[in-house]
Amino acid sequence: MKVTETKIPGVLIIDTDVFGDHRGYFTETYSKPKYEKMGITVDFVQDNMSFSAQKGTLRGLHWQNPPYAQSKLVSCTKGTVIDAAVDIRKGSPTFGQWVSVELSEENHRQFFIPQGFAHGFLTLTDNVEFRYKVDNVYNKESEGGMRYDDPTCNVDWGSLLNGIEPVLSEKDQIGPTLEESNNQFVYEGE
């Protein structure tokens, strides 16, 4: 397994080992002792999966506020996405900055996003299956979100959309800006 630090400390790209032969392949998607050695020491308590039928589907940017904040370990098991994490911790030296990575069924890559980040992804193919491991349970009252095209963060979805309108949920179409959002995260240092 290879771990790559991104420009934002704590946000990691993980390239899993894939062992293939004429039958197909095997890859270990999670091993607590191995991930702890990489610095991922959260206790995952829930696994989720989403399916997006149409290319150009954009889900995000979302989070859960404390005390139900979630770290996420995400991967794409069918199709291809661009996945993005935005630092929304007030006072952070990287506040408002974002990083992205391509995740696909071919590259078997994972993206670790700690608590205090907004998360979203854009499907680059039809029929995308996306998986999440999270370290806290879902809590509707703790939901947070901001516009995918927030001008403060300026995540570069546009060049990936190639002029087509993204497929958005109603909630994501009318989401607030980061400044207007109910974001409750505060940077507490390293």
For the regions a protein language model found, what residue spans apply to each?
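Non-catalytic, conserved peripheral segments adjacent to functional cores
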Residues: M1-E106, T125-N127, V134-E190
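Short beta-strand His + acidic residue motifs that chelate non-heme Fe in jelly-roll/DSBH
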Residues: F111, H119-L124
